[in-house]
Amino acid sequence: MIDTIVAGARIFDGVDPTPFVTDLGIVGERIALIGDLSERDARERIDARGRTLAPGFIDAHSHTDELWLADGRCEGKIRQGVTTEIGGNCGTSVAPLRGEAERRKAEEAAAVGVEIAWRDFDEFFAIVERNGVALNVASLVGLGTTRRAVRGDLEGRLDDAELEAECALVRESIERGALGISSGLIYVPSRYADERELLACATAARDAGKPRYATHLRSEGDDLLAAVDEALDLGRDADVAVQLSHHKAAGKKNWGKVHRSLDAIARARARGITANADAYPYVAMWTDLDTILPEDASHGGREATLERLRDPETAVALALRLQLERADEWHDIQI
């Protein structure tokens, strides 16, 4: 006996881009039959004429990790057809939590009513599974989180001991369930990671069996092409798959550059580098407001940045710099 027949749906099967109209039969939790089921009996029959049926969507770039605990129903995604979600993007992840990384994550989690009761990925996912979640979920390990764990938000090159500690956290995180690594190279503290640090962490991920690197590029605007080259070179040098997150050419003066960046990705693929990009279908983005500040304004960490902004003389000087450096961009920024 078929449990459920979905009748007359327009089906996108995820393989052939051309949809087809037919019936689908479900037994238990499995799709058992696809075809004309008009003569078959079922416990339930859903009239899907005029509706579209597809496999669950994979949201490969999300920032709702803590919400898996705050509200396991995840209706905001389920109602969009998302059934699998990947967290830990843009260099920020729910683990590993050490030092400043633990303190900051506790603040972020508290904002959605979640109390930190884990330090590593296996502990986090055990809590998620125990509480229940409507989605299939997985996570990358963020290199902003690992760097923050060993050096806080301080700028500068990691010394050898700090770098080895960060690589150890990458390896341990993958052993405890992370799918790979991510970076957010416009954000503190990821923006301070140099080629040496990124290469070491990517190599650690590869050696741990998860050679995947997703990156929010160092620039998505004026320096987009150099930033794309940086990511593709890392893929080549570390022998890891590269995912360019929410790929775009930001700012109207840069829009045409996306053709050249896509050409760069195609050339890299032709050379044997595993490189892909994802994008969203609108000309807007959300991010932290402090990313518009000059880089040196963020030196010393968040408290040092806030102290500068509280100082009237320094705040005026920063405002003048922003007027000069972003004179043609203010009409595009909404708060």
Put a short name on every predicted segment:
Residues 38-39, 204-212, 233-242, 267-274:
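Secondary-structure transition/capping motifs at alpha-helix termini
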Residues 1-40:
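N-terminal metal-binding scaffold of metallo-dependent hydrolase/deaminase domains
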Residues 90-97, 110-237:
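Hydrophobic, small-residue-rich alpha-helical packing segments that form membrane-like cores
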Residues 128, 134-160, 166-187, 241, ...:
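Active-site neighborhoods of metal-dependent hydrolases
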Residues 9, 29, 50, 61, ...:
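Divalent metal-coordination and catalytic microenvironments
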Residues 103-116, 295-305:
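Acidic, Ser/Thr-rich peripheral helices and adjacent loops at domain boundaries
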Residues 74-114:
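Hydrophobic or amphipathic alpha-helical targeting/insertion segments
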